[in-house]
């Protein structure tokens, strides 16, 4: 799978916002999560994240189109993926897996963490296939949604 990660800038905040809304809409409707779902992030909040010195936001490019995004927060030698998203029409093509592999080439393959929805088996399978393991922590967001935490 050939993808490129293009470093996002402040000018990309509206594009990121539109892609997040489209990418997370189905999850939002399913779990009614007003607290943590990126669909609720404003463009201004995305700009703030883009400006942070510990934050690296990338647009995922596939066949000349931006098809998603991923943000990495680096603290010391620990890296956290939050969020990773691919537009619905580009899913199940290996794009997220290719993006994670590229990130590990850029930032190193160790000391990663992320969270995902416990009930989303496709996401969990992806992360486990990439070598991530549950760390035993979980956070209940509401009666429909529990987040589980992974490390690598």
Describe each PLM feature range.
Residues 3-18:
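A short beta-loop-alpha structural element at the N-terminal edge
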Residues 45-59:
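A short helix-loop-beta-strand connector motif used in the catalytic cores of GNAT acetyltransferases and
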Residues 59, 65-73, 80-85:
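Conserved beta-strand in the GNAT
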Residues 81-82, 92-103:
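Glycine-rich acyl-CoA binding loop
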Residues 84-91, 116-118:
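A short, internal acetyl-CoA/4′-phosphopantetheine-binding micro-motif in the GNAT/acyltransferase core
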Residues 97-98, 102, 119-136, 142:
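Conserved active-site alpha-helix within GNAT-family acetyltransferase domains
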Residues 105-118:
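Conserved GNAT acetyl-CoA-binding A-motif
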